[in-house]
UniProtKB/Swiss-Prot annotation:
Residues 83-111, 122-143 have a biased composition (Low complexity). SUPFAM superfamilies: UBA-like, Ubiquitin-like, XPC-binding domain. GO terms for molecular function: damaged DNA binding; DNA damage sensor activity; polyubiquitin modification-dependent protein binding; RNA polymerase II cis-regulatory region sequence-specific DNA binding; RNA polymerase II-specific DNA-binding transcription factor binding; transcription cis-regulatory region binding. This is UV excision repair protein RAD23 homolog B. The gene is Rad23b. InterPro entries: Rad23, RAD23A/B_UBA1, STI1_HS-bd, UBA, UBA-like_sf, Ubiquitin-like_dom, Ubiquitin-like_domsf, XPC-bd. It comes from the Eukaryota.
Amino acid sequence: MQVTLKTLQQQTFKIDIDPEETVKALKEKIESEKGKDAFPVAGQKLIYAGKILSDDTALKEYKIDEKNFVVVMVTKPKAVTTAVPATTQPSSTPSPTAVSSSPAVAAAQAPAPTPALPPTSTPASTAPASTTASSEPAPAGATQPEKPAEKPAQTPVLTSPAPADSTPGDSSRSNLFEDATSALVTGQSYENMVTEIMSMGYEREQVIAALRASFNNPDRAVEYLLMGIPGDRESQAVVDPPPQAVSTGTPQSPAVAAAAATTTATTTTTSGGHPLEFLRNQPQFQQMRQIIQQNPSLLPALLQQIGRENPQLLQQISQHQEHFIQMLNEPVQEAGSQGGGGGGGGGGGGGGGGGIAEAGSGHMNYIQVTPQEKEAIERLKALGFPEGLVIQAYFACEKNENLAANFLLQQNFDED
């Protein structure tokens, strides 16, 4: 018999095989004809009529019609994180990453470039030396050596691995972004993908729900359809977040790259936990999660921004995509008690710059913008886009009006 196979990237090919052969034999034929790198047997999943084909079952048992096709989904093996040992010569380029971070951590990372190696050369004083290590670079940190030193005392040692991954240059950065976003679909490709997955035997509502839960990753959407969309199990783990992640009470604009840059150092020192767990305690990540849940199509732009500002974090995300998506799917926490207080203070002193309310779940976050930024947002709104979407796109594109306009025009605004 001749089996027609189709990938989620619309590649179609045919394999001749005896119906008495098993599914595993078909996988081995696919690997031999298409290459071990692209179609490894261990990573293949064959799907027909909404069911995963079992390796030990004969092909004739599934009654595969030669006029129909079998979907081939290849899952990449989970990469092993090796970013921790790369801690040699950190003083080359840590300052650019530290400068791009938010003011709360910029003051903490400012002393990191010069004493990055001296604290590691004197490990005799571990816990007590945290204050002395932060008091030595007092000229770089200027004032406030006491209170900031209590929270970011870890950062001088933590920033060392960051430049190790950023040294290869822009090519590696773009490769990371392509790897993280290659499987995401938007615009017309989204509709094509919905139709394609529906041809496997699923209802449109199921397909759209799975794509939304996977943030338009078709491979993972098919997994969710087959295995079930994950619930809110991981949200129970966020019961008592550590208090050290409280930056400043003032609301910050949702520039996700800055949020990512502030947390670069923490990625390599989450002892015993998942490399991405530290994001849960970052107010910027909670803001990012809220934005993405409202509009999943913004995810590629946000990943691109993270790749520019923080390639190490993007690498961690690409290596743990499933965990990252589960974290994004968690319900947004009502953190309005602390952030709301800071926002109220900013609103009370209004009259200088403009204030724009960002849509939230149950509360409003006010973002302070300059008159020029407000004019740019009004111009984007004049194109016919809703204000909430315009604000998200404008800040996601680093306040680049032209880029935000192009991004908005490329999106599909059909209500699910």
